[in-house]
Amino acid sequence: ANIVFDVESATTGTYSTFLTSF
């Protein structure tokens, strides 16, 4: 996942994965 959205990944892994897709 993105480092900036690392905190978001801890809460919702799906959100982090979605940003990584782009």
From Swiss-Prot:
Q: Which family does it belong to?
A: Belongs to the ribosome-inactivating protein family. Type 1 RIP subfamily.
Q: Which GO terms describe its cellular component?
A: extracellular region; Golgi apparatus; vacuole
Keyword annotations for this protein, in alphabetical order, are: Golgi apparatus, Hydrolase, Plant defense, Protein synthesis inhibitor, Secreted, Toxin, Vacuole
**Reactions the enzyme catalyzes:** Endohydrolysis of the N-glycosidic bond at one specific adenosine on the 28S rRNA
The organism is Phytolacca dioica (Bella sombra tree)
- Quick one: a GO biological-process term for this protein? defense response
Location of the protein in the cell:
Secreted, Extracellular space; Golgi apparatus; Vacuole
* Broad class of where this protein is predominantly found: secreted
Q: Under what name is this protein listed? A: Dioicin-1
The catalytic activity of this protein is classed by the Enzyme Commission as 3.2.2.22
Please tell me which top-level EC class this enzyme sits in: hydrolase
Q: Which GO terms describe its molecular function?
A: rRNA N-glycosylase activity; toxin activity
Q: What does this protein do?
A: Nicks pBR322 dsDNA. Has adenine polynucleotide glycosidase activity on herring sperm ssDNA.
